[in-house]
From Swiss-Prot:
The keyword Membrane applies. Belongs to the complex I 49 kDa subunit family. GO terms for cellular component: plasma membrane. It is found in: Cell inner membrane. It holds the Pfam family Complex1_49kDa. It comes from Francisella tularensis subsp. tularensis (strain WY96-3418). PROSITE patterns: COMPLEX1_49K. Keywords: Cell inner membrane, Cell membrane, Membrane, NAD, Quinone, Translocase, Transport, Ubiquinone. NDH-1 shuttles electrons from NADH, via FMN and iron-sulfur (Fe-S) centers, to quinones in the respiratory chain. The immediate electron acceptor for the enzyme in this species is believed to be ubiquinone. Couples the redox reaction to proton translocation (for every two electrons transferred, four hydrogen ions are translocated across the cytoplasmic membrane), and thus conserves the redox energy in a proton gradient. This is NADH-quinone oxidoreductase subunit D. Coiled coil: none annotated.
Length: 417
């Protein structure tokens, strides 16, 4: 009689634009996963070491490229760590702008997640709905920085510039008719704050559409309910954070438990799951988008009523005004030295953790008093989640593997660094 043996299957890696360069070596008993061995490091770019050879203000651009779908949230933790080292005060208006863009980034991340997860499980329509909404938020990125993704907008001491009084306009092209461009430009006639007033109303309707497509969909629930279950206690032991932890029923969110910036002045709830499965993680992220929408609305209302500076007046870290730089040699020299040599910080070490869309993103900086960090270490939320891959996949069918990987929501830019 023939002897039956388990066999090994290489799952991935795929292109970074797909699910990322994860290589899983699966041991299968028929269609059942017996063991999963994740291999990481295929997108390692040496970001931490690169940052140790550059002045503090020249490494902000690297942060955007860590988790490249949550760009400004990466910048946020980094600039807050520098501010903590320098004991730098940030203007109140800049704090509200940062929080507003951090919540926009959370929505961008979760929309991409639900779009990709939908495709993995056969729901193509969700992808189209989600990307339609993401375009509006990318327009906001473009309006403040000129870039649709890698903005480098957050700066130590505040943000690069105040909110614009006009939004980018669509133009007639061979792909966009004059009539369509006019319709798209209707909410873009005023300032960014006017545009966001329109957005928060329309976004609720867009979320309702996605909700209708997925939440009670029989096939969606069959693919996600009781799949990849993690208990609350086990999630804490594994070092889960973010929606992975809250999906298991643990109400841990750094915006509430360790408030930073102006989150303590804003009203929002922490959505949690009950069962810790893929379906609960989906529900948590959907609810988080609604909470982020509320936070954006509160920030818009405050910013409209409270004009003011958006960058610290500490000339050690803040560049001169552009007009002054063009008319005054001393200001030009100041600008040149600031962006070529940077600035020195006090000796010491700091850690700053922020509530990233994927979990706790942390930046640890050890300074020896120079103009560049002696050591820079980043805590990627996805690393702990990938480390639990064997436990999450074991006992499930091979067809459940894409569902579990999707609901982890891992991007290897920050895991591999």
């Amino acid at each position: 009689m023939a002897e039956y043996k388990n066999y090994t299957l290489n799952f991935g890696p795929v292109h970074p634009a797909a699910h990322g360069v994860l290589r899983l070596i699966l041991e299968l008993d028929g269609e059942n996963v017996v063991r999963a061995d994740p291999h990481v490091g295929l997108l390692h770019r040496g970001t931490e070491k690169l940052a140790e050879f550059k002045p503090y203000n020249q490494s902000i651009g690297y942060m955007d490229r860590l988790d490249y779908v949550s760009m400004m949230c990466n910048e946020h933790a980094y600039v807050m760590a520098i501010e903590k080292l320098l004991q730098l005060e940030v203007p109140e208006r800049a704090k509200y702008i940062r929080v507003m863009f951090a919540e926009m980034t959370r929505i961008l991340n979760h929309l991409l997640w639900v779009a990709a997860c939908g495709i993995d499980l056969g729901a193509m329509t969700v992808f189209l709905y989600a990307f339609r909404v993401r375009e509006d938020l990318f327009d906001c990125y473009e309006a403040v920085s000129g870039a649709r993704m890698h903005a480098a907008y957050f700066r130590p001491g505040g943000v690069a510039r105040d909110l614009p009084t006009q939004m980018p306009q669509y133009q007639k092209t061979r792909f966009t008719s004059k009539r369509k461009a006019k319709k798209l430009n209707e909410p873009r006639q005023g300032s960014m704050l006017d545009f966001l007033d329109h957005f928060v109303v329309d976004f609720e309707k867009s979320l309702d559409e996605i909700d209708t497509l997925l939440t009670d969909n029989r096939l969606w629930k069959q693919r996600t309910v009781d799949i990849g279950t993690v208990t609350a206690e086990r999630a804490k032991e594994l070092g889960f954070t973010g929606p992975m932890l809250r999906g298991s029923g643990v109400a841990w969110d750094l915006r509430k438990t360790q408030p930073y910036e102006v989150y303590h002045k804003l009203e929002f709830d922490i959505p949690i799951g009950a069962n810790g499965d893929c379906y609960d993680r989906y529900l948590v992220r959907m609810a988080e988008m609604r909470e982020s929408n509320k936070l954006i609305k509160q920030c818009v209302d405050w910013l409209r009523a409270n004009p003011g500076p958006v960058l610290s007046d500490n000339h050690k870290v803040a560049p001169p005004k552009r007009n002054a730089m063009k008319n005054n040699m001393e200001e030009l020299i100041h600008h040149f030295k600031l962006f070529s040599e940077g600035y020195c910080t006090t000796e010491g070490e700091v850690y700053v953790g922020t509530e990233h869309p994927k979990g706790e993103f942390g930046v640890y900086i050890k300074s020896d008093g120079a103009n560049k960090p002696y050591r820079l270490k980043m805590r990627a939320p996805g690393f702990a989640h990938i480390s639990a891959m064997d436990e999450l996949l074991s006992g499930h069918m091979l067809a459940d593997t894409p569902a579990i990987i999707s609901t982890i929501d891992v991007v290897f830019g920050d895991v591999d660094r």
